[in-house]
Amino acid sequence: MEESINPTINIGPVTFDLTLLAMTLLTVFVTFGLVYWASRKMTIKPSRKQNALEYIYDFVIDFTKGNVGEHYMKNYSLFLFSLFLFVAVANNLGLMAKVQTTNGFNLWTSPTANLAFDLGFSLLVTVFCHVEGIRRQGIKGYLKGFVTPGIMTPMNILEEFTNFASLALRIYGNIFAGEVLAGLLLTWAHQAAYWYPIAFIMNMVWTGFSIFISCIQAYVFTMLTSMYLGKKINGEVE
């Protein structure tokens, strides 16, 4: 497999990955575009695209409301719905194409196949959960969850780091591995003409499986986020 790198730009001491930035913005635009396209001109008798959008929304609500709580669901339903769609689109973008320059620069990838993105995104989601916990319970009620019972305080603090790490590493491992194998199959197809039909069929099968796994990972990421959010806004329930 040929080695490829993403083009970067340095602004002061900070290095920006241009491919990652572009693909993240593309994910935002695609997610917004899909929702806008499916929701414009909504009618009492829904069209197929409106039905699809409502089905996804109801699906997200159904598997997260038990964690967040029905009394809070109306406050966080759009957040969780947007999160699910964003992660699903981000996971699948890299499967749509492979764009690479002659000098080895990679111009197309799933944002979630990058560990730095996954760590940053998971940190953002984790901070959101903590902020909402403080807003709903107050600082006293929020801190009580860490020190009750007192002997479990170190484990409660450690759990916050493991929750954050599990969000990032789980999605990174699955999406990165999927792109690597897809790249290997494409490389194999270019080795010799007689390998092309076999590699093409295997790549089609693997792409279909990867789309399924990508959607499962979006489901898992949203489910875990709703669990962490529910614990923070409702307090620890024994």
UniProtKB/Swiss-Prot annotation:
Gene3D superfamilies: ATP synthase, F0 complex, subunit A (1.20.120.220). The chain crosses the membrane at residues 18-38, 77-97, 114-134, 167-187, 193-213. GO terms for cellular component: plasma membrane; proton-transporting ATP synthase complex. InterPro entries: ATP_syn_F0_a_bact/chloroplast, ATP_synth_F0_asu, F0_ATP_A_sf. It is found in: Cell membrane. Keywords: ATP synthesis, Cell membrane, CF(0), Hydrogen ion transport, Ion transport, Membrane, Transmembrane, Transmembrane helix, Transport. The keyword Zinc-finger does not apply. It is a multi-pass membrane protein. One of its GO terms (biological process) is proton motive force-driven plasma membrane ATP synthesis. One of its GO terms (molecular function) is proton-transporting ATP synthase activity, rotational mechanism. CDD domains: ATP-synt_Fo_a_6. Belongs to the ATPase A chain family. Key component of the proton channel; it plays a direct role in the translocation of protons across the membrane. F-type ATPases have 2 components, CF(1) - the catalytic core - and CF(0) - the membrane proton channel. CF(1) has five subunits: alpha(3), beta(3), gamma(1), delta(1), epsilon(1). CF(0) has three main subunits: a(1), b(2) and c(9-12). The alpha and beta chains form an alternating ring which encloses part of the gamma chain. CF(1) is attached to CF(0) by a central stalk formed by the gamma and epsilon chains, while a peripheral stalk is formed by the delta and b chains. This is ATP synthase subunit a. The lineage of its organism: Bacteria, Bacillati, Bacillota, Bacilli, Lactobacillales. The gene is atpB.
